[in-house]
Amino acid sequence: MKKLFIIGGTMGIGKSTVSQILKQKLPNSVFLDGDWCWDSSPFQVTTETKEMVMKNICAVLNNFLTCSAYENVIFCWVMHEQCIIDKIISCLNTANSRMIAVSLICSEQELTQRLQKDVRAGIRTSDVIERSVQRIPLYQKLNTIKVDTSGKSAAEVAEEIAAL
């Protein structure tokens, strides 16, 4: 039976890093970051682009799920509302798959420190800090397994998720 890991969390919490480590750790794994499905310049969030990104995500994930080469499908994206997770799941062919939905969480202080490091490195702009911190409480409301990343390395978090 395949495993489908759906990994959500606010911006800067470590979804992509953890997912990349998980991909290397688990056998026959493939990884999709939802951000890759609408990586554009300028980045535009409209009704049309939101519909497009969902179609792109579902198409790629379904291709991974039906490909016999893969045992572990790893998907990460911000997914701060249950309706986003539900919409993605509803369009997937999950027969013969076990779905593991995870939300990465951490303290406000730790998230701020991580994001400030990214801002200093030029990876993110400073406005992301406030937006990301404001979303932290939204993840507690989701029907997902919560994995607290506070004080843990990305490898430790990946190990915890792999054990689920």
Regions found by a protein language model. Give the residues of each.
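Pre-Walker A (Motif I) flank of P-loop NTPase domains
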Residues: 1-4, 69-71
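Hydrophobic anchor at the beta1->P-loop junction of P-loop NTPases
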Residues: 7
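P-loop (Walker A) phosphate-binding loop of NTP-binding proteins
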Residues: 10
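ATP-binding Walker
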Residues: 13
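Conserved substrate/cofactor phosphate-moiety recognition/catalytic segment
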Residues: 16-62
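Glycine-rich phosphate-binding loop used to anchor ATP phosphates in small-molecule kinases
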Residues: 52-96
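Conserved phosphate-donor/acceptor-positioning beta-strand/loop module used by diverse small-molecule
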Residues: 95-115, 147
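Small-molecule kinase domains that catalyze NTP-dependent phosphoryl transfer to phosphate-bearing small molecules
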Residues: 117-160
